[in-house]
Amino acid sequence: MTYKFPDNFWWGSAASGPQTEGAANVDGRKPSIWDHWYKIEPGRFFNDVGPTNTSNFYYQYKEDIALMKQTGHNSFRTSIQWSRLIPDGIGEVNPKAVDFYNRVIDEMLANNVEPFMNLYHFDMPMSMQEKGGFESREVVDAYATFAKTCFELFGDRVKHWFTFNEPIVPVEAGYLYDMHYPNVVDFKRATQVGYHTTLAHALAVKEFHALEIPEGQIGIILNLTPSYPRSQNPADLKAAHIADLIFNRSFLDPVTKGEFPADLVEIIREHDALPEYTEEDLAIIKNNIIDILGVNYYQPRRVKAKEYAAHPDAPFMPEHLFDNYEMPYRKMNPYRGWEIFERAIYDIAINLRDNYDNIPFFISENGMGVEGESRYRNADGMIEDTYRIDFIKSHLKWLHKAIEEGSNCHGYHLWTFMDCWSWANAYKNRYGLVEVDLDNDFKRTVKASGHWYKELSENNGFED
């Protein structure tokens, strides 16, 4: 069967500044929370590999953009590091950072690769974290100023802007589950961070629309993880509804509809965790919705009704309201510990079609991390990652079905272009179309999937 996609479909990939640029201590950049956390707890990073060098994009961006073109990219998303552009979080703009991002943008355009630019990818400047991070209203305003600065500096050439990547992740990883700095476990503080992140997003949208950039669009990148109940039993259905409210609709509803779900607000109120807010700020959220949505999809969430009550003195967690459910015989990526469930990408698209005014969206991340890929190297030195090609195809088939049924999808970006640093997992799992050899001066080698991806893009689809 032939799977053809709409004209002008975005084929490309996504990455981020902190995961690829390296040059962490170069040309005026100051520490983010990742530099600080690695400094004080290097043992929490796989093989003690920190964020200092990552994949060396700062120095090899020209080679990398040429490889993007070679692997069929017509678009690519990365992020501007706040700690590089405005090293103190507020105040003076770093001219060397402006020069770097200008060169990257211009090189992309010269190679017919459309830049998609994100403003925040988990990388709070340490100077801002010391003020409380997104617990602080002052930092919300500082972020809005940073966003406006980016729009003014680069908006003449960058038309596709995104305020945050996966904003739920710093909330849950940094303030609930002790997986990111500042390693807080406190539901009320987490809700304050989530609310202030939403407000910061809305303020950036307001600044962007005020500039009236021709053909400009602004959106947000959300990791939508559909919540599937174990059964159709009412208690299981309620568990799935609650998980969906907390992990998906907490951001999806306010950025598309301008308001938080009433059921979610009630849950937060019941657990005495309402954030500090003002009516003026709620109006800003209400009046500044997105133009386009980026959807990151990796895995489903399967849940069931609680089997045992939580300890009454334990800190409240979302899992006090549902249990995670491990479906028997599910297909897994054993390296990442994630279920592979391709149909969910269809379910997301149809949900957006039916419940969110069929908002324009694109798949902004989807990918497969594999450990020890060098064992798949052939005699010519190329990694034969046919498993990645199969993974992409199987998801695109379901995306194609959703498009045929009227969902408003405009593109597909793989995570990721080249092997990159994955936070505390460092380089444990590799996701790229292009191999990066950390032991050989960051040498780049296109994998089998990269050659196939060029065919996919050139044909605007594939046969299978």
Would you name each region that the model predicts?
Residues P31-A66:
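Aromatic- and Gly/Pro-rich amphipathic surface segment
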Residues N74, S83-L85, F122-M124:
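A short acidic, glycine/proline-enriched capping/turn motif at secondary-structure boundaries
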Residues Q60-Q81, N287-I292:
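Catalytic domains of carbohydrate-active enzymes, especially glycoside hydrolases
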Residues N8-W10, Y58, S75:
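A common structural microfeature
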Residues I80-V93:
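Glycine-rich, proline-tolerant flexible connector loops at the mouths of alpha/beta enzymes
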